[in-house]
Regions:
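Feature marking well-ordered beta-strand scaffolds used for ligand recognition
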Residues: 1-361
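Calcium-binding loop positions in Ca2+-binding modules
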Residues: 30, 81, 131-132, 177, ...
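Acidic glycine/aspartate-rich repeat arrays in secreted/surface proteins
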Residues: 274, 407-493
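Cellulosome-associated attachment modules in secreted, modular CAZymes
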Residues: 494-679
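A recurrent domain-boundary module in secreted/ectodomain proteins
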Residues: 341-361, 367, 479-501, 661-679
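A structural detector for beta-sheet-dominated domains
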Residues: 25, 49, 71, 101, ...
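Glycine- and aspartate-rich repeat motifs characteristic of hemolysin/RTX-like Ca2+-binding segments
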Residues: 352-414, 418, 456, 473-479, ...
Length: 679
């Protein structure tokens, strides 16, 4: 997909070598690329051309007053009626930059009145809150991040500062809330600040959970609004990583993916990354010390899918990538890359003339004759790609995939039902298993060749492949020499460990799919729609969960799986005594045993209350290992338990529900096996 086109240069070493930053600006429907070099250099303007080479448009050597003080930054800002290419100027007292004329050429050197942090700038971002325009600037020397009102005459008024540094900065609005996101390579900090609606000052939002991703030396930061969400992508140089997080309305960052560079990709020691959205599809381009660039796309749930990489050649000039810019021009992505070693700008292209639709659904989902991205929903789904180079993504339930003609990518989902691919073309199609946790090479899979294809098994996952030609398939035919693309690290280790153990609630509980459920903290929620495979999600520590069910009425059965926390101490030796009393024909010490007591007493779940149950409960109480770990069970509160006796402990867990537009509530009874209490 990545096509090398050419290297463009002016012929002046001061303008072509040591390019530190690039920026794009469109005037009157024409897009211009601005490149800046460091001290002793200047600015070059290239006019982008649909289907052709960029044309030299203008240049400007840095004037003598700033020539030896300029850093690598070249960022676009609008000050009043003027557009400015702002620079990092070491000893300046105001913000310095060159005015940009509406024909794309470079105008006069400008400097604002003095601002508290001066003009030694490492990152900046401009945004609006209501009718007020703001500029937030990271000032290197002063060690703080300042926020300024941009007045109508182009002057800056300081409204506040927060301590810290940033090498990358972006702004994003989620609903009515405006946020500034920063990244700093020195302390590995990813910070989110909300903007006060009245004063414009920045207030930091606690996002310490992002530290679990292991992002080291973040060098690039991008935001994008896509698929109905706001996303933050961070590239880490020392961690050789690209991370995707969803920015929620309250300013919290929720990790969705964490991809690591491999021998097959080219974003090791990543220095820059750009994200662009085209017709509902998100593309990511990244590169750095790995002498090349990698192209990825992002799914509607924030996962990165590998598309292609381009490695440096003797002609291309991208050894040690420094900066990247991506523009959508005509039917192409035009990618411009500057190197720390080579002069000029390298132009790569990606053709988008066959870009199709992004479609997510249940039942039968049909693509077009172009390059579609089809995602299965939460119900059993049949994805039919048709012609084109399609991406087909498995859902949470059973998924059947038919790629059709073209080079298709079949993306598996961990924790789904059986996935069947009906027309896999070895050597043309690709099977992407990046969602399978800790999977690094095909040798970890169990691949069984069948008469018409192959069966692939990993942990509890199964993929049935039927070859397009009807013949058998081997692991080598499916995967070649190994997996393509980056490795992915789980952002939620609950997928490996299952539901966490935490305290619960005994007795009547109401399960609300739209709110907190204290009795369901850290539990696994399993919903089986009528006629479909089960759907499973894990609740958070407040018992909140989202099954992501489709609109309309959906009847089914809900069950809950919750482990016992030994730290709670709810099961004691007295519980073992109560069970032993029941087993020998006596009642508990408080009187006759209720049906709920008998269910709790039968911890072995063999249908009777006996001495083995008492022994298992005693082992739990004193901390000894047992073959029968306690767990919570949840029953329909209206269930008839009158037939339960000590020799007939027969019951059904869960409850029938009818979800309406994805929501339901149901009254249940929560019972901890092994815990015998008066009801």
């Amino acid at each position: 997909m990545l096509q090398f086109e050419r290297v463009v240069a002016t012929g002046s070493p001061a303008l072509d070598s040591g390019i530190g930053d690039t920026a794009l600006k469109t005037f009157n429907g024409v897009t211009y690329l601005y490149s800046t070099t460091r001290a002793g250099g200047g600015i070059v303007v290239w006019q982008l051309v649909d289907g052709g080479a960029p044309q030299f448009h203008d240049d400007q050597y840095f004037s003598g007053t700033i020539s030896l003080q300029v850093g690598s930054l070249g960022a676009l800002v609008a000050l009043g009626a003027s557009d400015l290419l702002a620079l990092d100027v070491d000893t300046a007292t105001g913000l310095v930059g060159y005015e940009l004329n509406t024909d794309g050429t470079i105008g006069a050197l400008q400097e604002t009145a003095a601002i508290p942090g001066g003009g030694d700038v490492t990152a900046l971002v401009q945004y609006s809150v209501g009718a007020v325009d703001y500029l937030t600037v990271a000032h290197q020397d002063s060690g703080f991040i300042g926020t300024y009102v941009v007045n109508s005459n182009g002057s800056l008024s300081h409204v506040g500062s927060v301590a810290g540094n940033a090498g990358a900065m972006q702004a994003a609005a989620v609903g009515s809330n405006q946020y500034v996101v920063t990244a700093n390579a020195t302390d590995n900090a990813i910070r989110v600040f909300s903007t006060d609606q009245g004063s414009g000052t920045l207030i930091e939002v606690d996002n310490t959970t992002t530290q679990t991703l292991g992002i080291s030396s973040p060098t690039a930061l991008e935001t994008v609004d896509a698929y109905g969400h706001t996303w933050v992508l961070v590239a880490g140089s020392s961690s050789n990583s690209i991370s995707v997080m969803e920015l929620r309305a309250d300013g919290t960052l929720v990790p969705q993916d964490h991809a690591l560079d491999t021998l097959g990709t080219r974003f090791g020691a990543v220095q820059d990354m750009k994200v662009v959205e085209v017709d509902g599809r998100v593309f990511v381009v990244a590169g750095g010390g790995d002498d090349g660039v990698t192209l990825l796309t992002m799914t509607p749930d924030g996962k990165l899918i590998y598309l292609d990489s381009f490695a440096d050649t003797v002609d291309s000039g991208i050894q040690n990538v420094e900066t990247i810019e991506v523009a959508h021009v005509g039917d192409d992505l035009q990618i411009f890359v500057a190197s720390q070693q080579d002069a000029g700008l390298t132009q790569l292209t990606v053709s988008l003339d066959s870009l199709g639709n992004v479609i997510e659904g249940n039942g039968i989902v049909t693509g077009t004759a172009q390059d579609d991205m089809l995602s299965a929903g939460v119900l059993d789904t049949d994805l039919q790609g048709g012609a084109g180079d399609d991406i087909l993504i498995a859902g949470r339930s059973e998924t059947t995939m038919q790629g059709g003609s073209g080079a298709d990518i079949f993306v598996m989902r961990f924790g789904s039902g059986l996935t069947t691919i009906t027309d896999f073309e070895a050597g043309t199609d690709r099977l992407d298993l990046f969602d399978y946790p800790m999977l690094r090479n095909p040798g970890q899979l169990t691949v069984t060749s069948t008469a018409q294809g192959a069966r692939i098994e990993f942990m509890d996952e199964t993929v049935e492949l039927f070859s397009a030609d009807g013949g058998t398939l081997t692991s080598a035919e499916i995967f070649g020499s190994g997996f393509k693309g980056p490795d992915h690290i789980p952002v939620d280790f609950g997928v490996l460990t299952g539901p966490e153990a935490s305290a619960g609630v005994t007795g009547p509980v109401t399960v609300e799919s739209s709110g907190s459920n204290p009795a369901l903290s850290d539990a696994e929620i399993v919903f089986k729609p009528v006629g479909n495979s089960p759907i499973s999600v894990q609740a958070d520590d407040q018992g909140q969960f989202d099954l992501d069910l489709p609109s309309g009425s959906l009847p089914g059965h809900v069950d809950i799986i919750k482990s016992y926390s030994h730290a709670s101490g709810e099961i004691t030796a007295l519980d073992a005594l109560q069970v032993l009393r029941i087993a020998v024909g006596l009642g508990p010490t408080w009187g006759p045993a209720a049906p709920e007591n008998l269910i709790a007493a039968d911890i072995t779940q063999d249908g009777t209350v006996n001495a083995l149950d008492a022994l298992a409960i005693l082992q739990i109480a004193v901390g000894l290992p047992t073959a029968h770990e306690p767990e919570w069970v949840y029953l329909d509160q209206t269930a008839d338990l009158s037939s339960i006796t000590p020799t007939n402990v027969d019951y059904q867990t869960g409850a029938a529900v009818a979800a309406l537009d994805g929501m339901f509530n149901v009254d249940m009874t929560s019972i901890l096996l092994g815990n015998i209490e008066a009801v």
